[in-house]
Amino acid sequence: MAAPTVSMQALLDAGAHFGHQTHRWNPKMKPYLFGDRNGIHIIDLSQTVPLMARALDLISQTVQHGGKVLFVGTKRQAQEPIAEAARRSGQHYVNHRWLGGMLTNWKTISNSIKRFKALEEQLSGDTHGLTKKEVLQLTRERDKFELSLGGIRDMGGIPDVMFVIDANKEELAIKEANTLGIPVVAILDSNVSPDGIAFPVPANDDAARAIRLYCEAVAEAATRGAQGGRQARGEDLGAAVEAPSEDALA
């Protein structure tokens, strides 16, 4: 099943071509810039379109062959779209705070996930015998785990691909992925370095509408990959995940 594509017009409509002020640029992004206007760098969307298509194809193929995608975006305007896209496509996410060692120290993280699940089970069952204070303490611990680990609770191991919004903010996550040889797909604004990004997608990483467009595209790529995998195995596709309403995806 073919991966989705994102049109030039959809990127323009979302403001994906607007970079940062020219004095805030990272010179390593020069090859991806069209020029500047009124002191703002303009990203070359003629490169973004094929690079996005390449990244979406990677994600679709990865999921089709049983791989896992980790969505990472902890900045305010990315938190909701990241979580929604990952949930809708049956993938995994970190949208609150990247914990050091989240991938490179997976054994410790997996033990924390076990504790998190045990707390959920305990609190959803009979809490008879516990004081109100004890229940409150356990609830607070559970909620803290939910924020940091809720999106990866069912990942079951390190991911096969990482998708990142804002490579500057998620520098630690990218470093861990690089250490483990996990390919990174990242939206790169004019103020970031493309170093360590195997699948760069030059585009604005601040505009809420643009972020939602990218997340929906990646979710759709993962969904189509999963459908393709089921199809290859001869499984029923009747329960396929609902496609996004964004008409920019083809």
UniProtKB/Swiss-Prot annotation:
GO terms for molecular function: structural constituent of ribosome. Keywords: Ribonucleoprotein, Ribosomal protein. Residues 225-250 are annotated as: Disordered. InterPro entries: Ribosomal_uS2 (IPR001865), Ribosomal_uS2_bac/mit/plastid (IPR005706), Ribosomal_uS2_CS (IPR018130), Ribosomal_uS2_flav_dom_sf (IPR023591). PROSITE patterns: RIBOSOMAL_S2_1, RIBOSOMAL_S2_2. GO terms for biological process: translation. It holds the Pfam family Ribosomal_S2. Belongs to the universal ribosomal protein uS2 family. PANTHER family: 30S RIBOSOMAL PROTEIN S2 PROKARYOTIC AND ORGANELLAR, SMALL RIBOSOMAL SUBUNIT PROTEIN US2M. This is Small ribosomal subunit protein uS2. It comes from Rhizorhabdus wittichii (strain DSM 6014 / CCUG 31198 / JCM 15750 / NBRC 105917 / EY 4224 / RW1).
